[in-house]
């Protein structure tokens, strides 16, 4: 009787093991087909197979459905469906699902904005070692729920520990400026900037370049090191890094003066949104410096700089309109330059208005 029972038990366990093995393979098969279809842009087929995987308990399938409905890939955007699929995935300890869920609560998409729900979802993902969720928790405690600076620092630190460059950079700024209620520490600021820059954060490389260029934060002036960091920042599409390199070449500061290189760096920076670089291009076109003199291009670039908030660009643009006998535009642009804080623009505005 005991032997017979043992045989039944062994056969039962074998059957259960085989069934579980086959069931797992079926899940993986669904997921594999779905992922292949998704990569090829066949979202209809991908959705169908992700649903099969999700229904069979494969959390990745649920997460992918959340992504599909959140972004409207092959279907209309449906945040409510995305929310439900992310919830299912998060309940199964899928960190990407928790991250997606946190994002919807954070932004109030498909549901009422709820920072506490966002915190709960992000916190679970953070525990599951999801760097961006830790970082987003830092953002919430830093900027959205006031009076939680210590929590913000804690989660920025966790994201940095997980090699999230943005988290390291924010901590660098905090220690350099004494923000987030931390004790100002140049030493710590440099350590965090260095890590962030090694992780290819352009802002951090730009910050290091400035510190070495000016001998700030207890660092000795080292123009060669500064140049290298600024060059890396520019290569990482940081407009400030490119703008600084442009200034170096324009003025011949620490490098041989080279107006053409200066112009090229200013153009890069301007195209990335550096207002002052657009204005400097305007000046170079107005003077014919490294480029043929072209007042139309000068005006266009001053206008770009002014539109992005550079008071010098506004002042120069207003001057061009004045010289073109366009008093109305000159007054309007001087007024803008004045509001941006340029005293001379205010003085010229007063003269043009006659009071």
From Swiss-Prot:
Reactions the enzyme catalyzes: a beta-lactam + H2O = a substituted beta-amino acid
GO BP terms: response to antibiotic
Signal peptide: 1-22
Gene3D superfamilies the UniProt entry points to: Tetratricopeptide repeat domain
SUPFAM superfamilies assigned: HCP-like (SSF81901)
Record-annotated disulphide pairs: 54-62, 90-98, 126-134, 160-168, 197-205, 234-242, 270-278, 306-314, 338-346
Protein role: May hydrolyze 6-aminopenicillinic acid and 7-aminocephalosporanic acid (ACA) derivatives.
The protein's name in its UniProt record: Putative beta-lactamase HcpE
The species this protein was found in: Helicobacter pylori (strain ATCC 700392 / 26695) (Campylobacter pylori)
Origin organism lineage: Bacteria, Pseudomonadati, Campylobacterota, Epsilonproteobacteria, Campylobacterales
């Amino acid at each position: 009787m005991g032997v017979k029972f043992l045989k039944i038990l062994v056969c039962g366990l074998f059957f259960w093991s085989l069934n579980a093995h086959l069931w797992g393979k079926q899940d993986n098969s669904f997921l594999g087909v779905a992922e292949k279809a998704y990569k090829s842009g066949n979202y209809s087929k991908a959705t169908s197979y992700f649903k099969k995987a999700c229904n069979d308990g494969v959390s990745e399938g649920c997460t992918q459905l959340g992504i599909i409905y959140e972004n409207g890939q092959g279907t209309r955007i449906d945040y409510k469906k995305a929310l439900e699929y992310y919830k299912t995935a998060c309940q199964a300890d899928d960190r990407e699902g928790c991250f997606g869920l946190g994002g919807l609560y954070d932004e109030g998409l498909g549901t009422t904005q709820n920072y506490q729900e966002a915190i709960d979802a992000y916190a679970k993902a953070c525990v599951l070692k999801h760097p961006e969720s830790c970082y987003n928790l830092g953002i919430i405690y830093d900027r959205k729920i006031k009076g939680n600076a210590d929590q913000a620092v804690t989660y920025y630190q966790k994201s940095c520990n997980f090699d999230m460059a943005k988290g390291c950079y924010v901590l660098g700024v905090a220690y350099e400026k004494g923000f987030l209620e931390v004790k100002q520490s140049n030493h710590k600021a440099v350590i965090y900037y260095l890590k962030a820059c090694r992780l290819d954060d352009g802002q951090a490389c730009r910050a290091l370049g400035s510190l070495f260029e000016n001998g700030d934060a207890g660092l000795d002036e080292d123009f060669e090191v500064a140049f290298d960091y600024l060059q890396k920042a520019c290569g990482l599409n940081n407009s400030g890094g490119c703008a600084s390199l442009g200034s170096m070449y324009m003025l011949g500061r620490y490098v041989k003066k080279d107006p053409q290189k200066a112009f090229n760096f200013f153009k890069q920076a301007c195209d990335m949104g550096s207002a002052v670089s657009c204005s400097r291009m305007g000046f170079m076109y107005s003077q014919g410096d490294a480029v043929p003199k072209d007042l139309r291009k000068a005006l266009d670039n001053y206008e770009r700089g002014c539109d992005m908030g550079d008071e010098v660009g506004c002042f120069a643009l207003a001057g061009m309109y004045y010289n073109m006998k366009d008093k109305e535009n000159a007054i309007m642009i001087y007024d803008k330059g004045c509001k941006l804080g340029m005293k001379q623009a205010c003085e010229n505005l007063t003269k043009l208005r006659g009071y």
